[in-house]
Each structure stands twice: as C-alpha cells, then as structure tokens.
Swiss-Prot record:
KW Metal-binding (keyword) present: no
Entries under HAMAP family matching the protein: Cytidyl_kinase_type1
Family designation: Belongs to the cytidylate kinase family. Type 1 subfamily.
Broad EC category: transferase
Keyword Nucleus listed: no
Enzyme Commission number: 2.7.4.25
A Pfam family assignment: Cytidylate_kin
Record field: catalytic activity: CMP + ATP = CDP + ADP; dCMP + ATP = dCDP + ADP
Main subcellular localisation: cytoplasm
Binding positions for ATP per the UniProt entry: 7-15
Protein name: Cytidylate kinase
Length: 222
C-alpha cells in the first residue's frame, strides 16, 4: 500500500508519518529530508543551485526504512542535525522553487518508491509524487502553532533562534509555495485534511489509521 502524507512545514506530518510506518511495518520516505540533503551537498561541494545536472551527479543515496529515512553522502551516513540548520533549510527552500529541480527530485522519489509499499511524506506527496496512492492525508496547523513547534525543535538541537523570525519565515514560505507558477502547494483533491493545531500526536495517528483502514477496505486492499 502507498500512503501519501502531505502538509506545510512544522505541521507534524513527519512525526505522524514515522509512527504510521512503524505501526504498519512499511518503509518511510521523508522527502523533505532528501531536499535538505541536496541543499547540504550543494553547500558542502559549493555547487550552484542552478546546476541541476551537477547536483544530481553527487554521491547521494536515499534508503527508506521502517520509521526513518537514511541518507548517505559518499557512502557515509549523514548526521541529521547537520541537515536541520537554518542555512540548509534556506537552501532547500531555494531549490524547491526551481521547477527543473522539483521535476528531477520527484523522478528520483518515484524510482525509489517504484511499486513498493511505502509511507511517503512531504510536500507534493499526494499531488505529484504518488498521486495514485489510495490513501492521501494533508496534515496542517495554524502558522503560530507550526512556528512554535519549529522553534522548540531547533532549540532542542542547540540553535539560537527567534520565534518571531521563524513565524515570519513560515508565512513567507507558505505564500511563496502557494504562488508557485508550477507545482503550486495545495492538497490533493481526494486528500483528507487534518488540522493538528489542538490535537495530540496520538489523536492524529489514530485518525490517520482510521482513514487508512477505511480507504483500504474500499479499495479492497485488505
């Protein structure tokens, strides 16, 4: 079964997707982490973001596993903390605004997924990466709640950050993503939208599992 979990940044979609992967015992592809990996190698190897061919020639390997996505550069595992910095996040957002890059990375995702069962989480998951998925969930939350979550996440990693700056960046990114002339950010037409602002992780997971069960039965997948 293919499950697409989409939504804006810091909405809680990654946490939910990891748990769903563990509960169903199927691999998890965190597409945002892959974006950050290419952003990281762009900075590390000093490759301009416009040089798409060079970026995709770099030694990056993506391995979806139960409850996590592992990425390797030159055969070595990448420290996830290095991928969570503000600098890498900014570069990832810049890459995401380039249509050719999105086309290439979406092609890479499709090659990784192929016909395997997988939880695919990230922007465009239900609209462009696996639009054929029988289960599509769009997880969202208020900008303020998302900024609070991202602030707490970065503080735990030891970064000195400002809540106001994070909120402003979230608002700017939402606007930029929704106004993209190509690949505008929006839920798939048949996605179930879940607002997590006032819900616990456990509540959201149960809601998603219920949707999976219902969609699976209707699609005669169980």
């Amino acid at each position: 079964m293919k499950i697409a979990i989409d939504g804006p940044s810091a909405s809680g979609k990654s946490t939910v997707a990891k748990i769903i992967s563990q509960k169903l015992n199927i691999p998890y592809l965190e597409t945002g982490l892959v974006y950050r990996t290419y952003a990281y190698v762009s900075l590390k190897f000093k490759v301009p973001i416009q040089d798409i061919d060079k970026l995709f020639s770099l030694p990056v390997k993506v391995v979806p596993k139960i409850g996590k996505t592992e990425v390797y550069i030159e055969g070595k595992p990448v420290n996830e903390e290095d991928l969570r910095s503000e600098e890498v996040g900014k570069r990832a957002s810049e890459l995401g605004s380039i249509p050719e890059f999105r086309e290439r990375i979406n092609k890479l995702f499709k090659e990784i997924i192929n016909n395997k069962q997988m939880v695919v989480e990230g922007r465009d998951a239900g609209t462009h990466i696996i639009p054929e998925a029988p289960v599509k969930v769009f997880i969202t939350a208020s900008p303020e709640e998302r900024a609070k979550r991202r602030y707490e996440q970065l503080k735990e990693l030891g970064y000195e950050v400002s809540f106001e700056e994070i909120l402003q960046k979230i608002l700017e990114r939402d606007k930029r993503d929704m106004e993209r002339p190509k690949y505008p950010f929006k839920p798939a037409e048949d996605a179930v939208i879940i607002d997590t602002t006032r819900k616990s992780v456990e509540e959201v997971v149960e809601e998603v599992l219920k949707i999976i069960h219902e969609r699976s039965q209707s699609a005669e997948l169980i």
